[in-house]
Regions:
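Hydrophobic alpha-helical transmembrane segments of multi-pass membrane transport/permease proteins
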Residues: 22-48, 74-83, 189-192
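Extracellular ligand-binding/catalytic regions of CAZymes and related secreted enzymes
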Residues: 256-284, 290-309, 315, 441-457, ...
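Terminal transmembrane helical anchor/hairpin motif
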Residues: 42-66, 175, 182-255, 630, ...
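Long, hydrophobic alpha-helical segments
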Residues: 69-93, 128
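Acidic, S/T/G-rich, low-cysteine, solvent-exposed domains in lumenal/extracellular/periplasmic regions
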Residues: 477-723
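Hydrophobic alpha-helical transmembrane segments of polytopic membrane proteins
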Residues: 152-178, 241-243
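Juxtamembrane extramembrane loops of integral membrane proteins
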Residues: 282-424, 428-447, 455, 461-507, ...
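Selective transmembrane-helix segments that form parts of the transport pathway or gating/packing helices
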Residues: 22, 83, 109-138, 163
Length: 773
């Protein structure tokens, strides 16, 4: 008899014993009932939400089955309960009864015994998989264009986890004659493997070893439809390791082996497994396959194209100030968790390295503001913080030492990353003061693109009463332009920003790509006007923002563009807001400019709040421009108020006898024309407050603000689509359901009653047949 036949014979025998065991059927029935109940509860919520909302642009395959809130995640979270009960008697039962000695006396090797019993265990694991597979099949029937590939990967991850648990349980079953002890021992080993990943996280080498050894989170990527080579290798190594342990244990029972030799053998197997795991988990060795239809877990095509142009080694250095309020996120113990931020980039570019530099220095917004540290020196604060975090004080560079490397006082000594190429090009990648905090793909790719190309420079004109970016006043523009810790700020989206005073000596150089002229209060000097006209003549792009009361100053220049500001400001009737607040919407024509105007504004019914706004009209078309209205008012309830000038407090009404008329008014235009080899682009807004510091931070009920969207899409169009980075993905095709709320009862009957009842009847039938024979 060949080895394979012996193994299969042992597997069939043990599998039959399992199926004749009431414990196995109890496990199968409890598992099926709880699993189907979880699935139907999730599906009920999804179906109800779908019926109420009318559908959303989301992957229903993913919502139902993938991710941390999907159905398969709940199965993975609970499967550890069942496997120890399944494997506890595979060897311990025979050891306790003495029947194992018959196997020892037969011409069967220990390896054949172990493999046979292991195949029986994972064979029963296949039976456990039937319920999740049935749920996936049902999902494919009710979700048209079901995304099968990632769901199959998630099912594979679940089965690999079952296989690993079975190998561990089989080993524990070989160590004792008591089945309960074997089950408890298996749970203890699983607990250790879950906990070990948090040990030694402050030490680089130990962190890599313990993180790899940890089984916690090993299926997370697969549950998202991603196959990682290190995860597959992990399961193969763990299964092989514990099967080897079990084989050696049975072999040592058959013949006398000294305890020293046993210890050396176990240690050798363990070290070999750790070595394999360590080297196969190095960034250059890891291969990743994203099986989702939209490649949701991978870099977008735009990011991949940008990264492909980045040649040579690249270093991202994290500068962590112990005395900064954000330091706890980036201490050594958090290194592994923070790797996920740049992991897609490191996998795509193996010579991209992430380093950490730890230091301590005074941070204006740091722990020094705590009353506990009043009057203390930075050294005293360092000593206290290192004591709190249980860190070595010598890990942190002193203020003098860090300033020899880099002076971060302009960054307020807060946490910051610097990306640097081999030839010395560098750029900042910051954290932000919002819910997500860490940079997204858009900000990281923008930083990379700034190093491989010349970023567009946005120059804000000042000196004639214009809004300024260097000031943080209510009417100024620092928030969206140079605010370092604002995600949407131009400097964090790939632009360079500067201010120029063209009326008093500054020039508009050829390096400037976009000029912003925001509400002049006094006319430009002759020199300034000549410069602006020369910039306009050579095809420079402009963003012009006007405001009420500035017609006399700005209309002369706007007339050269074929645009005119109406004499009086707009009013909008509202029960909630003052009449001077105009809530403009994107026009249908604006969709020709950018995808944001086309998709986001109508999809979310975004409104641009424009307090104190004037209507714009095309005065003539003698300059070769194509005029595209991008913002407009409602057709009703909006008019040009000609009688009153103070619209903030006084109630106003549309007076037809005064020439006031309710109709749609244009509040922003986009102008474009072809000049030689380039297209000139200009945006003109009838309000300058709409992108001011105050307006961007105000929150009003009753509408969804699109002011930041206006900024992003305007500069996207003005920069020719170069920045901000487009990280859109293909639309989901599995976003429809073919069942409704009325079908929930049928679904529950099938999954909660019919499937568990069928399994129960089969189990009872086998038990009855077995007992009768």
């Amino acid at each position: 008899m060949t080895d394979l036949k012996i193994i299969m014979r042992i597997a069939r025998t043990d599998l039959a014993i399992l199926f004749y065991s009431p414990i196995a059927w109890f496990i199968l029935n409890v598992f099926s009932f709880l699993t189907t109940a979880s699935f139907t509860s999730l599906m009920e919520n999804i179906v109800t939400d779908y019926d109420l909302s009318g559908g959303k642009e989301v992957s229903l395959s993913g919502i139902c089955f993938l991710g941390s809130y999907g159905f398969l995640s709940s199965v993975v979270s609970n499967i550890y309960i069942y496997i120890p009960l399944l494997t506890m008697g595979l060897i311990s039962r025979e050891t306790a009864s003495g029947s194992i000695k018959l196997a020892y006396s037969s011409p069967v090797t220990s390896g054949q015994i172990v493999l046979g019993k292991y195949l029986a265990a994972i064979g029963f694991g296949c039976c456990l998989m039937l319920v999740p597979i049935a749920s996936a099949i049902y999902g494919s029937l009710v979700i048209p264009s079901f995304d099968w590939a990632p769901v199959l990967v998630a099912l594979l991850g679940l089965y690999l986890l079952i296989c690993a648990y079975c190998a561990i349980g089989l080993f524990m079953s070989s160590l004792t004659t008591y089945q309960v002890v074997a089950a408890v021992g298996t749970l203890i080993i699983l607990a250790i493997l879950n906990f070990v990943g948090s040990i030694g996280q402050e030490y680089d080498f130990i962190r890599e070893l313990t993180y790899w050894l940890s089984i916690n989170g090993r299926t997370i990527d697969m549950l998202n439809g991603v196959i990682r080579s290190e995860d597959v290798i992990y399961f193969v190594v763990v299964v092989t390791l514990f099967l080897t342990f079990t084989t050696f244990k049975l072999a040592s029972d058959r013949r006398t082996i000294s305890r020293f030799r046993q210890a050396i053998s176990y240690l050798g197997f363990f070290v070999a497994a750790m070595a394999i795991g360590y080297f196969t988990s190095r960034p250059g060795m890891i291969k990743v396959w994203d099986t989702t239809r939209t490649k949701l877990n991978s870099l977008t095509e735009n990011s991949q194209h940008v990264l492909a142009k980045l040649t040579g080694p690249v270093t991202i250095t994290n500068y962590v100030n112990l005395l900064d309020n954000k330091s706890y996120r980036y201490l050594p113990i958090m290194k592994k968790a923070n790797e996920t931020i740049f992991e897609p980039y490191c996998l795509a570019k193996p010579d991209l390295q992430v380093k950490y530099v730890y230091y301590y220095d005074f941070a204006p917004n740091g722990v020094a503001n705590n009353p506990k540290f009043q009057g203390k020196t930075v050294d005293e604060m360092r000593d206290y913080m290192t004591m709190i975090y249980n860190l070595n004080p010598h890990l942190f560079k002193s203020p003098a030492e860090i300033r020899q490397i880099i002076d971060l006082r302009e960054e307020q000594n807060t946490f910051v990353r610097i990306m640097e190429t081999q030839d010395g090009k560098r750029t900042f990648i910051r954290d932000f003061e919002d819910m997500d905090a860490t940079p997204s793909e858009a900000e990281i790719t923008a930083a990379i693109k700034k190093m491989i190309s010349t970023p567009p420079t946005v120059a804000f004109i000042k000196g004639d009463g214009e809004r300024e970016v260097s000031k943080s006043g209510d009417r100024d523009y620092s928030n969206f332009s140079i605010e370092k810790y604002s995600r949407a700020a131009l400097i964090n989206q790939g632009f360079d920003v500067c201010e120029i005073d063209i009326s008093h000596g500054d020039t508009i150089s050829s390096l400037i790509n976009i000029v912003v002229l925001a509400e002049m209060r006094t006319p430009l000097t002759e020199k300034g006007e000549n410069q602006l006209e020369a910039y306009l003549a050579r095809g420079g792009n402009l963003f012009i923002l006007t405001d009420t009361g500035r017609q006399e100053v700005m209309n002369p220049f706007l007339s050269k563009l074929g645009i005119k500001m109406e004499e009086y400001q707009l009013a909008q009737s509202s029960a909630d807001f003052s009449p001077n607040l105009i809530l403009a919407k994107a026009t249908r024509e604006s969709g020709k400019l950018t995808f944001g105007f086309k998709d986001d504004f109508p999809k979310y019914d975004l409104r641009v709040s424009m307090p104190g706004c004037v209507a714009l009209t095309c005065s003539n078309n003698d300059y070769g421009f194509q005029y595209t209205p991008i913002l407009e008012t409602n057709a009703k309830g909006v008019w040009i108020e000609k009688e009153q000038t103070d619209l903030q407090e006084s109630p106003v009404e549309c007076n037809a006898s005064a020439g006031e008329k309710e109709q749609t008014y244009i509040t922003a235009y986009a102008l474009s024309r072809q000049l030689k080899d380039k297209e000139q682009r200009i945006i003109i807004s009838g309000d300058a407050d709409c992108i001011s510091n105050t307006e961007l931070t105000l929150s009003r009920e009753g509408y969804r603000s699109g002011n930041f969207n206006l900024i992003i899409e305007s500069f996207r169009w003005l920069s020719g689509g170069e920045f901000p980075i487009d990280i859109r993905r293909p639309h989901c095709t599995d976003n429809k359901l073919s069942i409704g709320v009325k079908d929930i009862g049928t679904m529950k009957t099938i999954f909660i009653i019919i499937i568990p009842a069928t399994l129960l009847l089969i189990g009872v039938g086998i038990w009855f047949f077995r007992r009768r024979n």
